[in-house]
């Protein structure tokens, strides 16, 4: 299963959040919200602010694991440089991200609505994939 997160970095420049759109196997699913995008890499780790920095662009494996924090099974991005514990979950504002990717429908600048509904739909798609099919996300 191929996920693609297309960020709108230029429109969010100077803001505390980063908006984007998530596609699943080439079809738009919903909008996303992340912390502020900062131009970081393993060469520039000093610009990262824990819990307030969007992950770097790249292609990452995704697994579904139990999250003690959320009390349920959620997608977890693997091998993200300089980051650990990056999940895809519901939330409405950048304060809900804790560095993760939120799903929902954009309602205002930096605000998502219907997040639980979109998260449920997303999890249904993940659960419906053929057994053993890997999940990958490309973040642009």
Which role fits each region the language model picked out?
Residues 136-140:
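Divalent-metal-activated hydrolytic enzyme cores
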Residues 1-135:
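Cell wall/extracellular polymer interaction/catalysis modules
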């Amino acid at each position: 299963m191929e996920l693609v997160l297309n960020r709108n970095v230029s429109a969010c420049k100077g803001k505390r959040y980063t908006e984007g759109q998530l596609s699943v196997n080439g079809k738009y699913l919903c909008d996303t919200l992340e912390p502020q995008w900062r131009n970081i890499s393993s060469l520039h780790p000093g610009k990262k602010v824990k819990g307030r920095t969007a992950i770097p662009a790249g292609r990452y494996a995704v697994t579904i694991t139990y999250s003690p924090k959320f009390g349920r099974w959620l997608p977890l991005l693997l091998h993200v440089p300089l980051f650990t514990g990056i999940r895809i979950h519901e939330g409405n504002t950048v304060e809900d991200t804790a560095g993760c990717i939120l799903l929902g429908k954009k309602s205002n600048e930096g605000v998502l609505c219907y997040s639980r509904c979109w998260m449920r739909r997303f999890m249904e798609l993940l659960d419906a994939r053929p057994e053993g099919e890997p999940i990958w996300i490309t973040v642009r």
